[in-house]
Amino acid sequence: MAEWLLSASWQRRAKAMTAAAGSAGRAAVPLLLCALLAPGGAYVLDDSDGLGREFDGIGAVSGGGATSRLLVNYPEPYRSQILDYLFKPNFGASLHILKVEIGGDGQTTDGTEPSHMHYALDENYFRGYEWWLMKEAKKRNPNITLIGLPWSFPGWLGKGFDWPYVNLQLTAYYVVTWIVGAKRYHDLDIDYIGIWNERSYNANYIKILRKMLNYQGLQRVKIIASDNLWESISASMLLDAELFKVVDVIGAHYPGTHSAKDAKLTGKKLWSSEDFSTLNSDMGAGCWGRILNQNYINGYMTSTIAWNLVASYYEQLPYGRCGLMTAQEPWSGHYVVESPVWVSAHTTQFTQPGWYYLKTVGHLEKGGSYVALTDGLGNLTIIIETMSHKHSKCIRPFLPYFNVSQQFATFVLKGSFSEIPELQVWYTKLGKTSERFLFKQLDSLWLLDSDGSFTLSLHEDELFTLTTLTTGRKGSYPLPPKSQPFPSTYKDDFNVDYPFFSEAPNFADQTGVFEYFTNIEDPGEHHFTLRQVLNQRPITWAADASNTISIIGDYNWTNLTIKCDVYIETPDTGGVFIAGRVNKGGILIRSARGIFFWIFANGSYRVTGDLAGWIIYALGRVEVTAKKWYTLTLTIKGHFTSGMLNDKSLWTDIPVNFPKNGWAAIGTHSFEFAQFDNFLVEATR
């Protein structure tokens, strides 16, 4: 057994770490200098034979869709605090990459994001919130990498087809205008552009996109393809020299830490360009910690990008709380810095794009993995994870069983790292509250007399970072306000002369796009309104409804009264609705149930139990035409509903048994222009 070295200083460190462990019961968090106390694996970290692949960074996706919707109207200082936890270097997640949806007006998981070109002759580079988010990220980290990717496309590009490749030049033009607009209007340099999220790629389109980028002087913008599976795009690149030349990065989604043979044969950069998508509990954190290491070890992926950045959408929408952190209550200011933020920090705070992986990375003998990266200037960062199968399952793909057990692991630094005198140590333990630590700095590890080796005692569900960098920090702010339900009384008159964002607070568009509108034809009460602005179905990514709809409020609302002024713009065929107890949204919006109160320009009304209009509770004639304002009131109490038009009762006490609760909503009968004003909801759970 090797002699104890620096025993006095080690004893002091052991006492400190035992105290830090507290009720965890571990007799000192497990750093043993050259103490081979038990059999275990030995792992050499060496750059003598060169380095591995270049590291491109860790990031997250905003969009795909509307995942940051509720973030924008958080009050200060909480909004800035959330952004700091995500983007500020050496503070929280400290992300290297921000990938955003190029809004295309379609439903793309949890809502729609507006296009910068709703129509062929329409250009507006201030819609939505992704521009704002990219600028906020750049404020905090000027070196952050920016990526744009379309999910859906505005309908005019399809010329009557649900397909973006009808006119390749036109679609390329549309995408390039977004990149040019980002620079012209926001001084944002987009670094990478994608093709069509998780849908078909077109090789000729990719080539045309490259030519158009070059023509616009955007040679620096690189192309990622195809944000889907490895196989097809990799095989196409191997068979098509021109396609091979224009694709810079092969990006795959949810690869399960493995890449395809053809992808590796290309020699191109390989990215997990969307991954994670898991509830941000400690299991989600375990998933994230495992794949951040093993995506490179198993699949040579040099970047991993989480969907999604921050869970800022109503939690009952699909994939609730599948963000690195949670910020879904702008009305209260409450947010939660979830454990995936600190798992991210183990890598992001101690590496940068442009560093290189060592060739000597791999799996631990008794489960877990290790990677090491260097900047080539003497700095070294080692990340070790021992995430158990039970606590590291991602939402997909299926994870084959593996075992992780307690072990001793000896690491030997060789090559240019053999003379490193000291390593900073950061530690995370996931699991029971009594044993849990998140990104805790331990005493540094001295290597002066150890021949560059050290031994760790590793248990399951742990994460270690050992690094020469001294800049790491666990940032913090005072606790945000306590969680509160959505206000039971909520009103909005939309009287905003110069709105900072194009969408009204808390409304979450699920099909169609609802924007602030200045009604120049009405200088009076309805001068400022909320308008549904799409008159054509977009090129869809999901199963958008046939009707447009925007939801708002508390999913647990049971008894409520909704009142809203409405204005149908389309004669004869136009129609609008208000609704309560809407029980579905996102990619499930077509099958939403609820109580929907419709009026139509043809002089009729209808009460339905679903958005599609198949379940009819009541219908009749009413004095309604287009181009005139009306006030609708819908009251739902217990098992009964009543409705009024301009304060005149249309029906009373119609029995409704399902659903029991849900959001409030507004919308239109089809993709048509319509306006809404003086929205009011009064509700109880």
UniProtKB/Swiss-Prot annotation:
Alphabetical GO CC annotations of the entry are: lysosomal lumen; lysosome; membrane
- A GO MF label: galactosylceramidase activity
GO BP terms: namely: galactosylceramide catabolic process; glycosphingolipid catabolic process; myelination
Impact upon substituting S68F:
In KRB; infantile; significant reduction of activity
Recorded E.C. number(s)? 3.2.1.46
Q: Known consequence of changing M117L?
A: In KRB; adult
Task: Tell whether Signal is among the UniProt keywords.
Answer: yes
Protein name per Swiss-Prot or TrEMBL: Galactocerebrosidase
